[in-house]
């Protein structure tokens, strides 16, 4: 799928999310693009990399490979399966693991759940104050710990800019 095809396919869901919640469709599209590799990794209709919770029913979760960057080498107990751990030059540790992620019946359900995720989790309260500005929202979502990648906000902002150029 090309980037233009990705935008065409998922923009209606992102616009509907923006209409319902006020969260910028540019942010939503950018995060879906980043987390799914522009639609290359959409297992279980999941585009946003939202982790399953312990109480998530078995039919609503899936065990997938992922990368996490953490501060210590002894945090493997946090994951169902650890594949490898490498120390990075900055003193942090890159974990290749399998972890539980949410799974959806439809992609539309995924977009709806993604927006609700920000409203349900109090750590995103500050981000929601700037939800209509995709760049500020990206900064605040990253600060709140959505992902462990150290350059998460800058990656999102580059993709937002790219999507804007296609609109």
For the regions a language model picked out, list residue spans one by one.
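Catalytic cores of secreted/periplasmic lytic hydrolases that degrade extracellular macromolecules
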Residues: 1-167
């Amino acid at each position: 799928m090309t980037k233009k095809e990705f935008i065409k396919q998922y923009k209606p869901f992102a616009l509907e999310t923006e209409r319902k919640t006020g969260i910028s469709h540019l942010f939503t599209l950018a995060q879906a693009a980043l987390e799914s590799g522009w639609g290359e990794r959409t297992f279980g209709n999941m585009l946003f990399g939202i982790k399953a919770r312990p109480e998530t029913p078995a039919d609503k979760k899936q065990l997938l490979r992922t990368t996490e960057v953490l501060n210590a080498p002894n945090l493997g107990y946090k994951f169902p399966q650890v594949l490898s751990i490498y120390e990075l030059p900055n003193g942090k540790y890159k974990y290749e693991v399998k972890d539980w992620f949410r799974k959806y019946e439809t992609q539309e359900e995924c977009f709806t759940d993604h927006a609700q995720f920000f409203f349900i989790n109090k750590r995103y309260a500050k981000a929601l104050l700037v939800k209509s500005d995709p760049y500020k929202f990206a900064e605040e979502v990253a600060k709140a710990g959505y992902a462990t990648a150290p350059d998460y906000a800058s990656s999102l902002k580059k993709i937002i800019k790219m999507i804007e150029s296609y609109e």
